[in-house]
């Protein structure tokens, strides 16, 4: 299995499979920050120390199997082309920060549910990404990988403070739990404007699809914990679970109310967006995200039938600049990307329609 597997096999498990509450919760992610004992943190370490960490993981962990998760392959950032790095970021397998690290690397599981980033902000960042609302399952997998690593190396740990990290906000459990949610009805009814401040008051953060500093394109929001010290991993996840469950209920209520009070307007919006995606010859990323959000809402409400509900997950990633350029075989100017994006969307919708036609003929 090579890096090309991750680039060309475009659909990760969280995009391809449906999990619990997947009409609203697109994915659940757990990230654990860890550092090696008696080794300077990445903000201060030398090139030799950084290289030694990669060598250690190459020797101790590459090719070895974690029960239920599989084997890992090491990808060194200095051996990856800029375009390939961008694709890995767009698939949420690595962070933008890692792409800039001179001695960065990543261990990737074959099914792409688990990635272990090396020499990012911390020596080790374990990430587990699951489809739908599965925070507890993702935490279980992350802890399994964490134990597997800790059996072979010693972590920087304080009895008083917990796991020691480069950034003080990660000290303690080192845990970041997050979910990606599609909340179009709360946006359309403007309820989101009062909900976000209320969530922030609970010690949670609301961001866009690519985390800190990113925009909530396509009405997709990432909600995560902010506090890692003074709470157990279980409590952090349960607190987030509770808020997400309430958001799911509020979004479903808003969808029902929209459909009951503004059915024609909603159907018009959905079908207009579907028409744009089906027929456009050029389309920018923001318009793509808006139209995909409308179509996914239409699928979930039963307005549009015969389309996969995963189409939002897939095309939100596949129409990003890195994937588009990979799809076309080289660098593209912005207007060329808009043309390629439109072609890819039309092709994907055509595949869906052809699949439905073949099923009808079989019946």
Curated annotation (Swiss-Prot):
EC number annotated for this UniProt entry: 2.7.14.1
Family to which the UniProt record says this protein belongs: Belongs to the ATP:guanido phosphotransferase family.
Phosphagen kinase C-terminal domain sequence ranges: 24-254
Domain of life of the source: Bacteria
An example Gene Ontology CC term for this record: extracellular space
Activity control, per UniProt: Appears to be allosterically activated by the binding of pArg-containing polypeptides to the pArg-binding pocket localized in the C-terminal domain of McsB.
TM ranges: none
The protein's role, per its UniProt record: Catalyzes the specific phosphorylation of arginine residues in a large number of proteins. Is part of the bacterial stress response system. Protein arginine phosphorylation has a physiologically important role and is involved in the regulation of many critical cellular processes, such as protein homeostasis, motility, competence, and stringent and stress responses, by regulating gene expression and protein activity.
Enzyme's top EC category: transferase
Positions bound to ATP: 27-31, 92, 125, 176-180, 207-212
Catalytic reactions of this protein: L-arginyl-[protein] + ATP = N(omega)-phospho-L-arginyl-[protein] + ADP + H(+)
Protein name: Protein-arginine kinase
Motif (RDXXRA motif of the pArg binding pocket involved in allosteric regulation): 337-342
GO biological process: phosphocreatine biosynthetic process
Keywords tagged on the record: Allosteric enzyme, ATP-binding, Kinase, Nucleotide-binding, Transferase
Coiled coil location: none
Pfam families, A to Z: ATP-gua_Ptrans (PF00217)
Gene that specifies this protein: mcsB
GO function term, MF aspect, one: ATP binding
